[in-house]
Amino acid sequence: MIPSAESPARAIATQDADSPRRLTGPLTVFFATAVGVIVMNLFAAQTLTGAISRSLHLAPEFAGLAAMLPQLGYAVGLVLLVPLCDLLENRRLIVRTLVLGAGFLAIAMLTQSRVLFLIAVFLAGAASSVIQMLVPMAASMAPESHRGRAVGNVMSGLMLGILLSRPAASLIAGSVGWRAFYGLAAVINALLAIVLYVKLPVRMPLNPTRYPALLYSLWTLLRTEPVLQRNAASAALVMGGFSAFWTAISLRLVQPPFSFDMKGIALFALAGAAGAVVTPLAGRAGDRGWDRKSLLAGHLTMLIALVAIGVAGAGWGGFSASAHPVLAVAMLVAGAAALDAGVVTDQTLGRRAINLMDAAARGRLNGLFVGVFFVGGASGAAMSGAAWAIAGWSGVCVVGFVFTALAFVLRLIR
């Protein structure tokens, strides 16, 4: 997800209260690292659902909430918190939001209450929308001629964080328990807040707009822009299928004949992340005018992958994972990589279409695109948990297939 260089609330005008600071190479790396670390708050729980649900005694149908609520919180934060960049001094807003996020992660680590845990991860997800405050800040520190490149470099950390979040969380949980991951995340987020307070310039909005007007403008764009509607809906549906798989895969891998421990799940997640290599290919396809063909190919690849995943994990077509465990694992890994590739393709081309729209509204359009995207992911995660409780791995694969098939049909008819 590579947002524009503008605030997701709107294209804002700001000024430095301090002397201007340039986005140097080391500072770019720092911003990318910060974004990558923060986004881990949203995706790490996908491979921890089994451990969390057992520890907090979550019913099987509610296991997916641990993965769903951070993403839902992020979407809420995009709508309610990020527009504050147009009203409040940016550095103070960023630092305070990150400190609050660290506090919520600490609560998630310490609490024995499943209700309080779920509330804490939801609020931590909302605070993680600070990512969309950091990106325009970084862009404003770059020369205008290099702004797009600067944003791309910073946001490369986002995809890296998403890809590494699942294996990192699994490795930490496998070594010292799932609570340690949330504790470590809380400490790192707090340290980031301190460093950002030192590194960021003070930036005040030049033309602050009333908060209700900002929120209403988001609704107007969502209601009136068909390109946004089409691409956001497609991204949300694809992310729903993707999240359904990753939310439940750890529950399946701990069962026979796989019987993976947390370290095994971490290696699986790392291998499955190989599909992200298609990112530059998708971008080039869009530049050559192959958007629709590439999107349909990506969605079709995901549908085939979900069938293969059903064969390997649920015995569709009479396949026996017990008789062919190595082949079953290989099919699951290949399917995971194909799902990653499909999501990245849809997201890259959808983002490209959004950024070709009205430049004056680009920030808001990007914010809405990302927000709808995460609502889709949260929905897939929630439905995955219910499907697992009702029909096991077959149910999960069906949920993922339905989400992806709807995206495929949407691209066929529009």
List PLM regions with ranges.
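Helix-loop-helix hairpin linking two adjacent transmembrane segments in secondary transporters
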Residues: 146, 153-200
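Helix-to-loop junctions at the C-terminal end of transmembrane segments
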Residues: 78-89, 277-291, 388
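Cytoplasmic helix-loop-helix junction between adjacent transmembrane helices
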Residues: 121-157
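Conserved MFS/SLC helix-loop-helix module at the cytosolic interface between two early adjacent transmembrane helices
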Residues: 76-114
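Juxtamembrane intracellular "pre-TM" segments in multi-pass secondary transporters
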Residues: 12-22, 200-232
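Structural signature of the two symmetry-related core transmembrane helices
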Residues: 93-106, 186, 293-308, 401
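C-terminal transmembrane helical hairpin of 12-TM major facilitator-type secondary transporters
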Residues: 293-346
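Intracellular juxtamembrane helix-capping segments at the cytosolic ends
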Residues: 130-142, 344-358
